[in-house]
Amino acid sequence: MTSTLATRLSTYSISLILQRIKIIKRCYSAPVLRDYQQDAIDACVNSIRQGTKRIGVSLATGGGKTVIFSNLINQLRQNYFKERQGNFKSLILVHRRELALQATATLKKIFPDLKVHIEMGKYDCDIEDSDVIVASVQTLIRRLHKYDTNSVNLIIIDEAHHSVANSYRSILDHFKASTAETKIPVIGFSATFERADKRALSMVMDKIVYHRGILEMIDDKWLCEAKFTSVKIEADLSDVKSTADDFQLAPLSSLMNTKEINEVILKTYLHKKQEKSLKSTLLFGVDKAHVQSLHKLFKDNGINTDYVTSDTKQIERDNIIQKFKNGETEVLMNCGIFTEGTDMPNIDCILLCRPTKSRSLLIQMIGRGLRLHHSKDHCHIIDFIGASSVGVVSAPTLLGIRSDDIEFDDATVEDLKAIQGEIIAKQQKIDERLRALFQTDEAAMENVTERNSVADWIHSANSVDLTLCSFDSFRNFTQSNNSYPSGKEFDEASEAVKEMELLMNSQYPWVKFASNAWGLPLKGKNHLRIYKEKSEDKLSMVYHLKMYRQLPCFITNKYADYVPKSIIKDANLWNVMSKVEKIINTLNSDLEGQTMQYQAISSKYSKWRQTVPTSKQRDFVFRKLKKVYGESSKDFIRLSLDDVTTYVNTKMTKGDASNLIFASSLAPVYPLKSLLRILEYQKRRSFIK
């Protein structure tokens, strides 16, 4: 054996052998990292050196997280060998087969000397012989008995927003890596550290050490440009039940999977295909039935289409994906399959036919189409938006545009930023006007007198909006032929005017639920309240802004219960309202799906708020008003129950109903009685005229 080897070696010169080794090394050398990829690695290494070892990297889909953590493993491995002897073993946790195969292929390509093993299904890992173990969480949780608690030196979690799940936490517990005192670095990678069930990622991660989102990646040309188009469909999402922070799929599918809506989706695709020469479109549907209906419709219209659901076998799924990558399939449809883990960079169009309240899900769907590819310059994102889409996130809302009234066609990120700038400029003009009104009492008074008569204005104004005001103060204020009161009366009237101007001119739907208290709903069953209360020295009044978070019923063992948090106290309501604006802007500016405990709401000027209420809303509001009216009918001289019925059936908008339902959840009588008093006063004015 030795002589044979010597004979073979004798036929080659030493220099030729070395040359071939260099060629092999060069073929398999790690690719040059992008600047931000190296920055992410450096941030992780520095954090570990400083003692914070449970860390996260937030990177937009298409940013190359597999390349990053492969190089990170290599760098930490090299640092380890510089400091000590022994083996360095890395564990990569994934929750999908595609992610496991992708990580394995990348590691073997970049670092061929590493022994990479898979722990998944039929693949049984040889722990002792491995440098890197890529493990399916579902499989590893059943095979933990194979692993010594000290057998790994590094844990990488792919798609780490799943890491709060019990299975992940059990694995981390096994390796003594579930607390901030862990000796093993735990590094999570995700496009969005936000969970639909709101379980705190702080249980697994102590710090997000690096973040780079979609907008930055597009600006720096690491992701392709997106062009956004919104298409209005006849779908009222307000009655669709929700679970956690997204819609229940069955009722959502019943609403979306109709002949009319599916025809709109088809016609939109055909128009865009002809106009933009689309070649590879990915469609997200609600559920299997929805996807199958759309597949049949598209196929009947001559479109080469295929679909994947959870029922699709793995071999068939792989074949379908490969055909799509090869350009043989024009439209690939799915429901919840391709939000993570599958790279299809040839996608040049995304059809969002699955409305969602989840920012993270929307970011994942959009991100599927933004990878760079030689066949495209940009990706068309077509969002099908219901006429009443309260609480639904869309591409524009991710970019900071809250208006439901603006429609887009091929709008780039720069276009949307320009629109956002226009909206901000308009709001600034409103703010400047309100600030001027607040400078002096006289300015506020003059603004009211320009209406000719406050009483006439009350007669013509929206009834629910008027419940924001201290109605008795305004009625007193308009007496004596609208002559100005003086002294204390003047101060009280002026203060009421200020409250009216700020609350009624706010772009958000405030409600008044007590004589000196107002509320503003936030998504997620949380809300803001402003209380007008005595200052600490009892000598003056201040406005106290609080944020309320609703506790789950399983914690309270009863119906809604809230945890309040004091935000600001100020004698000037303007300062409090400015703080509200900052809070909501802060929530809306978190564009890349970071965890948000509170979420902002749509504008009170949104188109859906002017539409007719649902039958459920009408019935609910009428029952509440009827009950309050019956208990205090003696307080109303001219108002009859028929008048209440007329208001609910002909005058109340969906926005009004939403306000009343929210207000009555905070106080069951006051807001409803205030509305009845407004209706009484408006009827009295009509009778006099």
From Swiss-Prot:
Miscellaneous note of the record: Present with 172 molecules/cell in log phase SD medium.
Keyword DNA damage: no
GO cellular component, one term: mitochondrial matrix
SUPFAM superfamilies in UniProt: P-loop containing nucleoside triphosphate hydrolases (SSF52540)
EC number: 3.6.4.-
Domain Helicase C-terminal: from-to ranges: 265-438
Keywords for the protein's UniProt record, in alphabetical order: ATP-binding, Helicase, Hydrolase, Mitochondrion, Nucleotide-binding
Any GO BP: mitochondrial DNA metabolic process
Family: Belongs to the helicase family. IRC3 subfamily.
Molecular function in Gene Ontology: ATP binding; double-stranded DNA helicase activity; forked DNA-dependent helicase activity; hydrolase activity; Y-form DNA binding
Domain (Helicase ATP-binding) ranges: 46-211
Organism in which the protein naturally occurs: Saccharomyces cerevisiae (strain ATCC 204508 / S288c) (Baker's yeast)
Binding site for ATP: L59, A60, T61, G62, G63, G64, K65, T66
Taxonomic lineage from the root: Eukaryota, Fungi, Dikarya, Ascomycota, Saccharomycotina
One Pfam family in the UniProt entry: ResIII
Protein name, entry field: Putative ATP-dependent helicase IRC3
Location(s), subcellular: Mitochondrion
Lineage top rank: taxon: Eukaryota
Gene3D superfamilies associated with the record: P-loop containing nucleotide triphosphate hydrolases
Motif (DEAH box): 158-161
